[in-house]
């Protein structure tokens, strides 16, 4: 006896659905690298297709089959980047869901990075939150695919405003103690003033066409270098002194971090097409306030270049 295909039957309410699929599909992703050890990601996938009003349901088992097929390609070395992996899944979903006009794949991963502390060169690890996305739109011939790659990194920021207040206070104290003006200036040049700090979380995502490539390592570096200082899981005394001094020599508002990321994106990825979309977010968890500070910018590469040329960034 042949079972009825319930998914292909007519629904009672015949409207199109924007997204139908599965969320939080957990997979271990192994991406091969030529001449190097493979990169391992602990990943969660969200996989969707659109559904016409003439169908009661989507065949969700096809989503799992496609993910497994593409993950095997990554192990075999046919897919070398996680955004390419999402793109490959989105493309295959269109093949397997012949009724779909649009497919979407999201991937959230934990990426373990080996680090060395700045002074003692002690080895430690850092977990970076990585995400990728691809959207495929059916078209005559090849589908139109847009993909994105991004990361979220934690760092340290030092408040410029409070630092100026403390510097002004120290100046009056030193003057009252009779310290010469040139000595005061020399002291300030060597020892940055105290200020309150924040743990900052920087987010950077770049959306590109399917034939473009973005280095995840470069995105992570931009994030780390756009705050006052990097932070580490393990610090010896010399390392701790270095990190604190580095942060206080480089005070930044939450707005400064976002603008610095934008500047570094343009410098690093200047060859990207102008319609590439950059999303930058920074959240600073305040130490002396009960609220957090936040700044954001979303723009195309062309828009950022135009503003920088005008001197607004």
Curated annotation (Swiss-Prot):
Annotated cofactor note: Binds 1 Fe(2+) ion per subunit.
Site (May be catalytically important): 159
Pfam family, one: GCHY-1
Keyword tags: Hydrolase, Iron, Metal-binding
Cofactors required: Fe(2+)
Reactions performed catalytically: GTP + H2O = 7,8-dihydroneopterin 2',3'-cyclic phosphate + formate + diphosphate + H(+)
EC number of this enzyme: 3.5.4.39
One term of GO molecular function: GTP cyclohydrolase I activity
Pathway terms, separated by semicolons: Cofactor biosynthesis; 5,6,7,8-tetrahydromethanopterin biosynthesis
GO biological process, one term: tetrahydromethanopterin biosynthetic process
InterPro entries: GTP_cyclohydrolase_FolE2/MptA, GTP_cyclohydrolase_MptA
Top-level class of the enzyme under EC nomenclature: hydrolase
Family per similarity comment: Belongs to the GTP cyclohydrolase IV family.
Quaternary context: Homodimer.
Its biological purpose: Converts GTP to 7,8-dihydro-D-neopterin 2',3'-cyclic phosphate, the first intermediate in the biosynthesis of coenzyme methanopterin.
HAMAP family: GTP_cyclohydrol_A
Protein name: GTP cyclohydrolase MptA
Lineage: Archaea, Methanobacteriati, Methanobacteriota, Stenosarchaea group, Methanomicrobia
Originating gene: mptA
